[in-house]
Amino acid sequence: MPQNDYIERHIKQHGRRLDYEERKRKREAREVHKVAEKAQKLTGWKGKQFAKKRYAEKVAMRKKIKAHEQSKAKGSSKPLADNGEALPTYLLDREQTNTAKAISSSIKQKRLEKADKFSVPLPKVRGISEEEMFKVVKTGKSKSKSWKRMITKHTFVGEGFTRRPVKMERIIRPSALRQKKANVTHPELGVTVFLPILGVKKNPQSPMYTQLGVLTKGTIIEVNVSELGMVTSGGKVVWGKYAQITNEPDRDGCVNAILLV
């Protein structure tokens, strides 16, 4: 089945334009001027949003540069003043190069990079069209308005979820199609447990479906695994863990998932 990779396939078969690199270089060079022009010309709400976005980008860049500098920094700590007293064993290496901070920073960076890289059981799934996902709901006195949509797939909503007023609710999530628990299988132990769902981490179809909590095949969900008695290396009980849905919940009427360990 195609996975919307026709552009990559075409590049592999026929290659790129001969002037691709030059065009890309020029486009990137022009981008700076476009950003500067937007920063000067945008006013009102758009200007505020743009400034907020730029500020967040600059903060992230500063943090990244600082973390990079810390990982490279290998300075020796200040030696203790010599009072003629013998130093204890654990203070003898104070004058040597201190690499603890550099190692700690590099470990943190690697953890951040690997945070969302799971070897999931289902790396590819079938694409779902909007016509299949949403059903048009006619409203109004003469049923002439069609701005409402009803989700036809199973969804997850939190404990304190409250529907919006009827005249303001654009997307309806039917109560009959809401799921609170999932049949989660542990791949190493080979046991299946009925666990409560804590949230939807990522729906492969679209970020909007993730926000709406739509449960389709391949969706990464977070489940409560406290019943399994799993503990960390530090001895703390693991509360939530990610799992991937392996079935079609709207066809089976239940959610089956495999725990990502």
UniProtKB/Swiss-Prot annotation:
Keywords: Nucleus, Ribonucleoprotein, Ribosome biogenesis, rRNA processing. InterPro entries: NSA2_fam, Ribosomal_Se8/biogenesis_NSA2. A motif (Nuclear localization signal 1) lies at residues 15-22. It is found in: Nucleus, Nucleolus. The keyword rRNA processing applies. A motif (Nuclear localization signal 2) lies at residues 51-58. Disulfide bonds: none annotated. Its main location: nucleus. It comes from the Eukaryota. Residues 64-84 are annotated as: Disordered. Gene3D superfamilies: 2.40.10.310. One of its GO terms (biological process) is maturation of 5.8S rRNA from tricistronic rRNA transcript (SSU-rRNA, 5.8S rRNA, LSU-rRNA). It holds the Pfam family Ribosomal_S8e. One of its GO terms (cellular component) is preribosome, large subunit precursor. Belongs to the eukaryotic ribosomal protein eS8 family. Ribosome biogenesis protein NSA2 subfamily. PANTHER family: RIBOSOME BIOGENESIS PROTEIN NSA2 HOMOLOG (PTHR12642). Component of the pre-66S ribosomal particle. Interacts with NOP7 and RRP1. Interacts with RSA4 (via WD repeats). Involved in the biogenesis of the 60S ribosomal subunit. May play a part in the quality control of pre-60S particles. This is Ribosome biogenesis protein NSA2. It comes from Candida glabrata (strain ATCC 2001 / BCRC 20586 / JCM 3761 / NBRC 0622 / NRRL Y-65 / CBS 138).
